[in-house]
Amino acid sequence: MNSPEKLELLNQLLKHAKCAPFYQNRLPKNPLSSWDELKSIPLTTKEDLRRESPFGLIAVPRLELYQYHESFGTTGVPVSVWLTRDDYLAHAWEIGQWGVDFRSNDVVMVRFPYSISAAAHMVQSAAQWKQSCVIAAGARSSVSPASRIVTMLQKLEVTVLTCLPLQVLLIAEAAEMLGFKPSRDFPHLRVIGTAGEPLSISRRRMLEEIWGVPILDHYGMTEIGAAIMDCCYGQPHPLEDYFVFELLKDDFQTNAEEGEIGNLVVTPLYRLGTPMIRFVTGDRARYMNQQCRCGKNHILQIRGRKEHTITVGDRIFDIWDLEEIISHLPCRRFWAVGPLEQGLHFVVEQEKEDSGITQQLVEELKSRYSMDLKFEVLPKGTLYDRSDLLNVANVGKPEYIYTAQEMAEKAYAKSTKI
């Protein structure tokens, strides 16, 4: 709810944000007197952030900066985000509202990437704030492939796994390759927390079937922090006391109607190091006002990025729509899609020997979705090479001293590298 008290918080933020070079001449001189005036403030885009990085958005003295992160877009040009200690703690508090509900007796494995990006650090801080024990097992590291994750999940009796939805699937694949059944052989695991890519209802259901535990998502970005949290019932609720959310039509002036998909614009109310005023996230979202079993009554579904949609005629298909089609197939884990003149062309990986797609099923789906559909079933491993899941890199400490025999054998030429 956008209350008068929240407007006062926003005005305090706007006053503070003028300390950043980028916002000095960009914000109104006088406080906003109503929420309608918010649209008079220019939007902040990714292009603005790239142009002003690394220092143009800092709004505090350099001595107050506590942690640095970068966000990489498709251009590869990084966006700089500087946090004060209060910013860092606020992000941990935000993730502490997650329906995952970190507990003092939890063993939490953090599988988000640690290098430069923010999610892993914030999840770790939130878990430790709740007195949980954390295993830092960052993704994109040669020393912690999926096979090692599987071993640690079982050996260390992990109760909470946090990672990208794709990682949830890849870890399951590795477990199956090692002879485990994810829903049976990890009895201590009680919940999996995800973030980093859209999690549709269909994909959530598939992952829950594989693992036999709830999958709870949260939405955030390095630029804004963690803004939308799944409750324990899997419904995404915006943290409205800590953010201003706008959902705009494609003109970026008109508010989207309830239930209509619009463009998500977010202003964090408590970001001091690098304020973000009316930040265009690039994500499409849908707002619904409906009572949830948890007691909250606002739901904000993230539908994915606008560039990650396919248009067929006058119909737009986003990741939620595409995964809903995939959910009817016998092979649903790994897929890709492209447009046909009057429909969609899917390629899917075979999962079992009998997981072919019958012509009868194709015709039923064509009728259900009123368009042409083409499905190709590819051999397992075509889209994702499973061999990488089990590879462990040979790493170690630097070595300087060798025996005479090792010197003669030139062991130094093939010593383990860091």
Predicted regions and their residues:
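Nucleotide 5′-phosphate-binding alpha/beta core
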Residues: 1-93, 97-98, 104, 155, ...
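Residue-level signal for inorganic ion chemistry
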Residues: 16-17, 71, 161, 220, ...
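Active-site phosphate/ATP/adenylate-binding loop shared across adenylate-forming ligases
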Residues: 47-188, 198-206, 210, 234
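A polyampholytic, Gly/Pro-enriched intrinsically disordered region
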Residues: 154-163, 209-214, 235-244, 393-403
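AMP-binding/adenylate-forming catalytic core of the ANL superfamily
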Residues: 161, 265, 270-372, 396
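Conserved AMP-binding/adenylate-forming
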Residues: 199, 203-291
